[in-house]
Amino acid sequence: MKKILALMGAVLLLSVSARAVEVSAPSAVLMEKETGTVLFAKNEHEKLEPASVTKIMTLLLTMEAIDGGTLRYEDTVTASPHACSMGGSQIWLKEGERLTVDEMLKAVCVVSANDCAVALAEHLAGSEEAFVERMNRRAAELGMNDTTFKNACGLPAEGHVTSAYDIAL
């Protein structure tokens, strides 16, 4: 009798009702890493401004260049007038100022430095516009069908969009 009561008590205590997940964000995705299975989605393909999440693609292309041997951490990057004109978060590079790739990467990662993101982009591709073409090409290769980049740092620009789904990829 005690075993039956204990079992019934355990069942009562362990019974939990599932309720819907409430997410206040306009869109969200929870994706299993190995299989890509979507476990939760809310407006996952809604196109939104990516802001500084853009810098993840800038960092990816920079790291791929390092891995590919076309760029080294010790290489020097010179700040152009265009890179120095960025608004938002920055380290206030001065025109002609030179930092190593390593220093620029740290500034992008720690400070979210727009000026350094653009300086790296220009260093790698000759211009921010040419680098953005690379960003969009790489996004397409990754299957990021909701994403269009317009700049290397994430400052607002018409048509500069991505989705929660694409970010999850």
Regions inferred by a protein language model and the residue ranges of each:
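Bacterial N-terminal signal peptides
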Residues: L7-S15
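Acidic, His- and aromatic-enriched active-site or binding-groove loops in soluble protein domains
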Residues: A168
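Positively charged n-region of N-terminal signal peptides that target proteins for export
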Residues: M1-I4
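Active-site-adjacent loops and short helices of periplasmic peptidoglycan-processing enzymes
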Residues: A18-Y165
